[in-house]
Amino acid sequence: MMNTLLEKGDEVICVVPGYQQFVDIPKSIGCKVRLIELDEYDWQVGVKKFRKMMNTSTKMIILNNPSNPTGTEYSIDFLNELIEVCKPYGTYILCDEVYRGLNQEVSISDIYENGISTSSLSKVFSLAGLRFGWIKANEYVIHQINIRRDYSMISTGPLVDKLGWIALKHKDELILRAKNIISTNKNIVREWLKENPRFECVLPSGGTVCFLKYYFDLKSEIFAKLLLAEKGVFFVPGSCFDKEYYFRLGLAQDSKPFKSGLDELSNFVDEHLIS
């Protein structure tokens, strides 16, 4: 999508912390990437920050809704305000909606002519191995994508098509399964946080990940490697998102190993970080 619509010299606005490719791909094309930081206390952002950055060179705003790694979910009011900011410039809003369906129901492509929605079976459907996804946008954008596709993947394989069709046919059951797992694990996190005051987390209303903050003087990559080596528990370190003293916590696994992993994190802290 970015390689199709963006050109060297275009300006792109990205929200951070966020998915690395949203920043690095435009940079590789030669775009000027401007960053807007989410507020740490609630992982939200106001439209005013976007308005200040907009100009005639702003080709695209890139969002993840809900966000990876924070779980941020943008409201319909926020999206409508952002659309009004973008309209005078014809700016695209590219929104990765890979977690859509758990809670967030508004798709940017349904409410904005230059809105582009991308999604896949990787997250909510737990079928990342299929590498199956889709794009929804206006006719011009889809036509440009089809032209580029002729020089890359051409089409998906018939087996992937079939398995994807089966998954989508049973989407209600699969989404309900995901909702139940995540709801249970969020409750586990809430109880765990009560017993571990040196950690805090804004639990998301949507999505399958959250950003766990810790209050120890230990860089996140070192912390993650030590924890993995000693306890066999892995978190994505916040340094991967240019945000130290955080871990990305995935909420979508079976509850028993999920709780066990948090308990091992507590044990590691008790053994090494609390004197």
Positions of PLM-derived features:
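Phosphate-binding glycine-rich loop
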Residues: 1-11
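A short helix->loop->beta-strand "cap" motif at the edges of active sites that frequently abuts
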Residues: 10, 31, 88-92, 113
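Hydrophobic residues in well-ordered beta-strands that form the structural core
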Residues: 14, 35, 62, 93-95, ...
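Helix C-cap/helix->beta junction micro-motif
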Residues: 29, 88-89, 196, 231, ...
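Active-site phosphate-binding strand-loop segment of PLP-dependent enzymes
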Residues: 38-104, 109
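PLP-dependent enzyme catalytic core of the Aspartate aminotransferase-like
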Residues: 52, 217-218, 225-235, 241-275
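Conserved core segment of the aminotransferase class I/II
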Residues: 116-183, 187-192, 263
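Conserved glycine-rich beta-strand-loop-beta hairpin in the small C-terminal domain of fold type I
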Residues: 165, 181-190, 201-214, 245
